[in-house]
């Protein structure tokens, strides 16, 4: 009985902690990585398209629903959409959005990163020699359904619906290959 009660309290505490951080209409946030929109839409699968909203960009949340978040960036409206693969991995819109948007990005930390990390972040692409953290800032979190753990030697991204990009790391967390 005690174990069940403690478990229920832990679950309830976890749920309220997550809900307290939920992104809501009117929030002013920053991008935690580069985003790669397809016109005015960003799918939570995080396609690596040529266009880019830079890391640390200021955005204002206009609307949040169960499956999408509308935000304003530099006077243009964008929509962050929960795709079926992310949803199938049991990730909510809030969880997915919080991987890419937050109250403040760490610009000072980015400026202290290596030259290769800074170049990759600026280009929005992974390069050999970058750190995991640099890749995360440059490309965003890899898709949840294909990368449930980030502590693996290869992250798989989708360039678009048909092509993938694999980023391989050595045991020190540095990129050894991008294919």
State what each model feature region is.
Residues 1-2:
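N-terminal secretory signal peptides that target proteins for export/translocation
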């Amino acid at each position: 009985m005690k174990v069940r009660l403690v478990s229920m309290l832990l679950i309830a505490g976890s749920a309220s902690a997550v809900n307290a951080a939920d992104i809501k209409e009117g929030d002013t946030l920053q991008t935690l990585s580069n985003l790669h929109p397809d016109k005015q839409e960003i799918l939570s699968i995080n396609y690596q398209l040529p266009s880019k909203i830079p890391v640390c960009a200021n955005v204002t949340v206009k609307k949040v629903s169960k499956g999408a978040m509308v935000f304003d960036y530099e006077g243009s409206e964008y929509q962050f959409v929960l795709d079926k693969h992310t949803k199938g991995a049991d990730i909510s819109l809030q969880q997915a959005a919080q991987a890419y948007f937050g109250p403040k990005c760490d610009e000072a930390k980015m400026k202290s990163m290596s030259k290769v990390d800074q170049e990759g972040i600026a280009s929005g692409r992974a390069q050999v020699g970058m750190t995991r953290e640099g890749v995360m800032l440059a490309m965003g979190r890899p898709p949840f359904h294909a990368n449930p753990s980030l502590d693996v030697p290869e992250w798989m991204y989708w360039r678009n619906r048909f092509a993938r990009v694999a980023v391989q790391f050595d045991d020190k967390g540095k990129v050894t290959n991008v294919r």
